[in-house]
């Protein structure tokens, strides 16, 4: 995909965002896809969850002739002011370094995506640097968020712009004929922001959803949990709406991912979710616009403690259980491979009639 480095901003206002309405996927197509699965020469429901997932994809795309060969991974890169509180092993400079690696196609998700010919699209939505990075899309809302122990992470305007950016990027991909997209992110401190968002939305304690991130010590984990707990109490976030939670303790990457989930529902593109950060964003999107979850495909159950709670809240069932915690979109790209395998059966496998065997009946 040709790199669009010139800044593009999407002029949604908060009022315009509030007017968005989500239409459900095409249930008639869902039934057609399920019916086709039953004609294939295999046991009924032999492909398990993948039969219902492909039916969901068909319903989202609005056709039983499913084409997801053109795949993209939108990777939202942003810095988080909360790193000032010692909740991470590394500093903000790592966000910039990894974004540069992504531009060179050298990071983990890029290598995985190249192996299946999926396109990685790193997006600077809020890196704390004025440097322009060739190969990274410039959609910078602001150079990182604020320390949410001192003040809200974002202003209302910044939050709206970040959400709108995610929506707009999905539209750009739709116009370039992408059939399916995966969520990705890179931002030091974003397991802290996602934990705070998750705890607030699920009305649970910091300890229940805050993990070690990139590998904190016991002391570091305790500090991280205390930071999340203090923020929840200071702003009384257990009683706040989803937008306020996102603005107060979220990140620009999470806001962009929230917009991406909404954009998938608006432009009818299936969105494959990665790990807890993407799922926290998905929960924000679903709380803002009920029905968004119907356009989301889970990939893996990560090892962060929030993973199970988020999946349950979204009523999504990840199929990969490998204890992954790499981020970047790696689990979602792994799901791309499994979907391709399932689609090879759906689109090419012999039917009962072709092998002259009576079809199994339900």
Question: For the regions a protein language model found, what residue spans apply to each?
Answer:
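N-terminal loops that bind phosphate or other acidic moieties
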Residues: 1-362
